[in-house]
Swiss-Prot record:
Component of the RNA exosome complex. Specifically part of the catalytically inactive RNA exosome core complex (Exo-9) which may associate with the catalytic subunits rrp6 and dis3 in cytoplasmic- and nuclear-specific RNA exosome complex forms. Exo-9 is formed by a hexameric base ring of RNase PH domain-containing subunits and a cap ring consisting of csl4, rrp4 and rrp40. rrp6 specifically is part of the nuclear form of the RNA exosome complex; the association appears to be mediated by Exo-9 and not by dis3. This is Exosome complex exonuclease rrp6. Disruption phenotype: Severe growth defects at all temperatures. Accumulation of 5.8S rRNA unprocessed at both the 5' and 3' ends. Accumulation of a subset of mRNAs, such as early meiotic mRNAs targeted by mmi1 and iron homeostasis mRNAs, and non-coding RNAs. Zn(2+) binds at D243, E245, D370. It comes from Schizosaccharomyces pombe (strain 972 / ATCC 24843) (Fission yeast). The gene is rrp6. Residues 630-702, 743-777 are annotated as: Disordered. UMP binds at E245, H246, W304, K347, Q350. Nuclear-specific catalytic component of the RNA exosome complex which has 3'->5' exoribonuclease activity and participates in a multitude of cellular RNA processing and degradation events. In the nucleus, the RNA exosome complex is involved in proper maturation of stable RNA species such as rRNA, snRNA and snoRNA, in the elimination of RNA processing by-products and non-coding 'pervasive' transcripts, such as antisense RNA species and cryptic unstable transcripts (CUTs), and of mRNAs with processing defects, thereby limiting or excluding their export to the cytoplasm.
Length: 777
């Protein structure tokens, strides 16, 4: 089989698997035995192939995989192994075809090929993505960030332009209600809720072309005078486009590095690192209800504006929600730029480090393009919303505005660290669920993991670094699972330790050791508590050698309240029934019972405690060496010994009783004749016997398969090669002539869609466009 046929078969298999995943497989397996057997055969084949694949890399890791659950739990290892093998195979194929050798004579592609193929973009240099040796800009901030867990955040707002409710009134309300200090109200909530959009927004208009981004030079704003000039022009605009570039990798809380603002004529790029404390002046424009502020994916932008600059937005239009209402295929800004402007945004710079100064021209142009075309896109979206509203007979424009209002009402609030329950975005519970559910096993590993997670958060706050920079989540899980004893063990876990982790490697080992010590102390404490409870919970012995009745007056009545018998009766019956004790309050009795817990013998689950009689006393005096049971239940005047009531035996299921005994009439006194009617051991014998036979029958098939498997020294490697080319497709056969009846018609095939998968490889490779802006750096 050559490379083209192999690739074709691989693509067909991928297509079938993609379609098969959409079908309710368990349902069809339950109604079609042939389909069930075929699925089992394919699954076992896949299992053996994966085991063979891993064995080529590491035999010890392959032996640990037994079933599908192991693959699910260790899919990261399987995926990494596949990536390594694919890269090596790709490299070997290129080398065999001579693609890696530089040709002696340079060849030039035809003009048609050049026109059809886009040039492949190289990866950005590492220094552009992470400027490791850059001095932290936050060290130059006039107000240093406070990362402590006890810090209470407050508004940065000092004045409130375009207000319906004055700022002083809101501050007075917070002072009167202390509960509002933990969750401050939105200062512009009344203005946002009561905002009315200008009438011209609902009118159709021709989109205003802003020209190419290459034809317009952005204006860099880094001084107060430049900021003032920009404000004057923005106040005369009807609509503006705004975007932010954020960084949160080398900072605990993160900060905004750039702000891009555009109107119909100009593009501004504001250096927010230099003008951090002066940008509150933009509220004059941002809170003006007569100026429409166009954002794309403003969910986080609104939060960052409040946190860093004290800025709030009134009359926001989020183009992301317009794409949702219109039902577009994509919802990202790159999709809109391609759809309306035929502009291919270089998304490599999404991951760039925007702290770099001065900015390279490529990064500057990328930042400018985010807002340069946004007002032109807003014109197109507005026209489509108006036209679609007439077709659907609903106000789609108002729907987008309502969603945008909810985004404007978002508030910035600090997320507290929760060491107990691990709640929150970066809480230990969320990280454990995503990355360590299969690796952190046992109470000790969990305690070490939680201690390391707490330590990571503390160091990140202290060094003003993100938790990902201090200790990535996967490395955190790996350290907690391996339980390093010394620094060398930590370095052996991963070769890519972060600089902070290398600097604090001794502290990491110390945290692990302290967590182990705490766990051992907790285990010892639980063992001692269990022993204490077990010691207190000894079966009650009313009469024993240590509890003799030598000083008890035998010839007197047991129930006679005399000075001689009073103390002895209290000693013997304090743990029995409070009814027989005179002169003690209910509180004293309750306290005595709590101090002395007792359990009934396990052979008698529920028993009735009876008062002592004179027969008990005489028996104890005559036979000192008798057992506890004989002392507590002696024969009385030759009468038949009375057994305690055992509720569990009387409550047995009728099917578990002897069938011959069920035909007899129920005895008048079930307590006395219980042992004659019911034999629990005999009743349960047949049930346990049936279970053993069933289990033996079930395991017989497994033992046969295992015996055959063990007989072969290397069943996977010695197996005959699988003929992929001539393999029968059982899904496609469901629509073949085999299934026709005598009238020449085929029956209903529920897997018809699966047998006709999409063969368009581009569609299979096409990635889903993400919703809006998810992460920024």
């Amino acid at each position: 089989m050559d490379e083209s046929e192999l690739f074709k078969g691989l693509m067909n298999s991928t297509a079938y698997c993609s379609e098969l995943a959409k079908v309710d497989i368990p349902f069809y397996k339950s109604i079609d035995t042939e389909f069930n057997e075929n699925i089992k055969s394919v699954s076992s084949r896949f299992m053996r192939l994966i085991e063979l694949l891993l064995s080529k890399v590491d035999r010890s890791r392959a032996e640990d995989i037994v079933d599908v659950e192991d693959i699910d739990n260790r899919w990261a290892e399987v995926s990494d192994t596949l990536d390594i093998l694919f890269e090596k195979a790709d490299y070997s194929i290129d080398k065999a075809q001579g693609l890696l050798k530089k040709p002696a004579i340079e060849t030039h592609a035809s003009t048609s090929d050049v026109a059809n193929k886009k040039p492949k973009k190289e990866k950005l240099p590492y220094k552009v993505i992470h400027a490791a040796h850059l001095t932290k800009p936050q060290l130059r901030f006039r107000v240093q960030p406070n990362n402590s867990r006890e810090f209470v955040w407050s508004w940065k707002l000092t004045e409130k332009p375009h207000s319906l409710v004055p700022l002083e009134k809101i501050i007075a309300q917070v002072k009167l209600d202390p509960s509002l200090k933990n969750s401050l109200p939105h200062p512009y909530e009344p203005e946002i809720q009561n905002s009315v959009y200008p009438p011209w927004v609902s009118e159709m208009s021709n989109p205003i072309d802003t020209g190419s981004v290459d034809e317009t030079e952005p204006i860099w704003v880094s001084t107060e005078s430049q900021l003032s000039d920009m404000l004057k022009e923005l106040q005369n605009s009807k609509e503006i486009a705004v975007d932010l570039e954020h960084h949160d990798y080398r900072s605990f809380r993160g900060f905004v590095c750039l702000m891009q603002i555009s109107n119909r004529e100009k593009d501004w790029i504001v250096d927010t690192l230099e003008l951090r404390e002066e940008l509150e002046a933009l509220n004059v424009v941002f809170t003006n209800p007569n100026i429409i502020k166009v954002f794309h994916g403003a969910t986080m932008d609104i939060i960052w504006l409040q946190r860093d600059f004290g800025l709030y937005v009134v009359n926001l239009f989020d183009t992301y929600y317009a794409t949702k209402v219109l039902g577009f295929e994509g919802h990202g800004l790159a999709f809109l730029l391609q759809k309306y402007c035929d502009y291919d945004a270089d998304k490599r710079y999404q991951m760039a480090d925007w702290r770099i100064r001065p900015l390279p021209r490529e990064m500057l142009k990328y930042a400018q393009s985010d807002t340069h075309y946004l007002l032109y896109i807003w014109d197109h979206l507005r026209n489509e919303l108006i036209s679609k509203s007439a077709e659907r007979k609903e106000n789609l424009m108002q729907s987008v505005f309502n969603s945008s209002k909810q985004i404007s009402l978002r508030k910035y609030e600090l997320e507290p660290y929760d060491p107990i329950y691990g709640l929150g975005t970066d809480g230990w519970r969320n990280v454990l669920t995503k990355f360590g559910s299969s690796k952190i096993i046992g109470r000790e590993a969990l305690m070490i993991y939680r201690a390391l997670h707490d330590w990571r958060d503390s160091v990140a706050r202290k060094e003003d670094e993100s938790v990902r920079y201090v200790l990535p989540n996967r490395l955190l899980i790996a350290i907690a699972a391996s339980k390093p004893v010394e620094a060398a063990d930590v370095f052996s876990i991963s070769k890519q330790l972060t600089p902070i982790a290398r600097m604090y490697v001794e502290d990491i080992v110390k945290v692990v050791q302290e967590a182990e010590k705490l766990y051992n102390e907790q285990v010892d404490r639980e063992k001692s508590q269990f022993k204490e409870v077990e010691k207190q919970n000894q079966p009650l012995a009313v009469f024993s050698e240590s509890n003799t009745l030598g000083d008890y007056k035998v010839d007197s009545s047991v129930f006679e309240i005399s000075k001689q018998n009073r103390s002895k009766l209290k000693t013997l019956l304090a743990n029995g029934s409070a009814f027989w004790i005179e002169g003690q309050s209910q509180d004293d009795l309750r306290k005595a019972r709590k101090e002395r817990l007792f359990i009934v013998n396990q052979n008698i689950p529920f028993s009735l405690t009876l008062p002592c009689t004179q027969g008990h006393v005489e028996s104890e005096l005559n036979v000192k060496q008798s057992t506890v049971t004989e002392a507590a239940n002696p024969s009385l005047n030759g009468e038949k010994k009375q057994e305690p009531i055992v509720i569990r035996d009387l409550g047995l299921n009728k099917q578990k009783r002897d069938s011959s005994k069920l035909n007899h009439k129920e005895p008048s006194n079930p307590i006395e004749e219980r042992n004659e009617d019911i034999e629990p051991s005999e009743a349960s014998t047949s049930v346990s016997k049936k279970r053993k036979q069933k289990k033996k029958k079930k395991n017989s098939g497994k033992l046969t398969i295992e015996a055959e498997h063990v007989s072969n020294d290397s069943p996977i490697i010695n197996e005959a090669p699988f003929d992929y080319k001539n393999q029968k497709n059982f899904i496609a056969d469901l629509d073949s002539d085999v299934g026709k009846n005598k009238f020449g018609k085929r029956g209903f095939n529920p897997l018809n869609k699966v047998s006709l998968p999409k063969r368009n490889t581009r569609e299979l490779k096409k990635r889903k466009v993400s919703d809006g802006k998810s992460t920024s750096y």
